[in-house]
Every structure is written in structure tokens, then in C-alpha cells.
Amino acid sequence: MARRFIDISMHLENDVPSDPPGLSPKISYIDHQMSYPDLAQFFPGLKKEDLPDGEAWAVEDVQLNTHNGTHLDAPYHFASTMDGGQRALTIDEVDLNWCFQPGVKLDFQRLPDGYVVQPDDVEAELARIGHTLKPLEIVVVNTRAGTAYGSAEYTRAGCGMGYEATLYLLERGVRLTGTDAWSWDAPFAYTAKKFAETNDASLIWEGHKAGRDIGYCHLEKLHNLQSLPAHGFYISCFPVKIKGASAGWTRAVAIFDDALQAGSP
């Protein structure tokens, strides 16, 4: 089989709701005509008509935070410590071996928005797809949020991975996970309601906080996971190397290649 790629990243773009209000990326586009003054300052005497087609260059000014778009969260995002008290890794310190491994997809599209996934749900889905987890496999979760992308409901859509479900994966050697939802955890609107009823702060970000016990990374805001089979592919998701940061943007892709699969354990 020839090597084939499926893009599982979302665009960074203006005017598409992928973050809560006030947190979205802002991109300014400067085209080949607009940029002439910037080019001319390097070359005194240059006239616009001297340039081929009268064009300079295209460039963009981008205002982002490290959690805009498809990105990889480092253990440092979840807490200052990991592995029971060790200093948490920042994104530039994450083991790159974690970021290129066989992928496994858990299909939780049927679960309602705000549902908190438990170990039994993970076990049932693994049984359904006939797969036993192996260390370092990248486990991605396909939620209803995938089909909500592009709408105002995106950040409130999809189920979330609970503390125990996350530990279930980590205890089996998984070190990198992912979701097509805004967050690995259930949407805040649902968790806020539970917190108001119980005053139990352990419910807040419970899946993320599993990283305090066993350090791991997760991808958020993946896209197009419905195009993937349950297994039989690799995922590549190397993060941008930002010094001391809690996350890095990534162009996550699924790779289908017989030679790669033959070499996997």
C-alpha cells in the first residue's frame, strides 16, 4: 500500500468558533501589494514596477495562545508536578518518541455532551473494536464535538475523559492521547453545574489532573477523526518547540503505511 495521509488538524482561522469568546486566534493577512513598503525599506530606490508583476511578498501577522487550534498539551499544563511529585515537563522537554506511534481511535460519538467517560466505557469500546492497548500507542477519542466544529456550540459539545478513564490508559503505558473536543475533560458548562451541586473541586479538570499521577500529553481540537478506522495507522503530532511552554501547536496527521505497521510491536 502506498503511503497515505489523513489530516486530523483543524485550521487556524478567523471567524470560526473554536474557543470561548475572547480567546480565538486573530490573523491579519498582508498580500503581495500591501507588503511593497516593507520590502522597499531594504532596497533604497526600488520601485514597485521594478518587481515581477509588481508584487512583493505575502505574510501574516498572527495573535495566538499556545492552546489555539490543534495543539499538544505538555504535563506542565495540567500541574507543576507529574509522576507523583516530579517536576512536570514543558512542551520543549516532551519525549518526541511519544509523538510518532501507532494510533487507536475510541468512538464515543454516541455519548451525550458533558458525559464523563469511565474505565468501563473504555474497556467496552476496546472490546468492540477488538484491540488490546500497547505501551506508547496514541489513543484518540472521537466525540460529538467533531461534527459541531464550525458552530457556536463547539466548545460545549462532546463527552470528556474522566480521571479514572485517563488513568486506565496511562497505566497501560499510553503516554499521548487526543480528542476532537475543545478539552480532554467534559465541557466546563457541565462540570460547573456539577460543582455547584456538590462543591467537589476534584470534578474540575479531572482528566487533566491524572497527569499529576502519571505524566502524559494530550492533543486537543483534533478534526476529521470520523475518517479514521479504529486502528491500523500511525499518528504524527510533533509540537512546535516553545521554551518552557505548556503546549505547542501541531499539524497532526494519521499515516497509513504497510511498512510502518509491519515494524510496530
Regions found by a protein language model. Give the residues of each.
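Active-/binding-site microenvironments in catalytic and ligand-binding cores
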Residues: 1-265
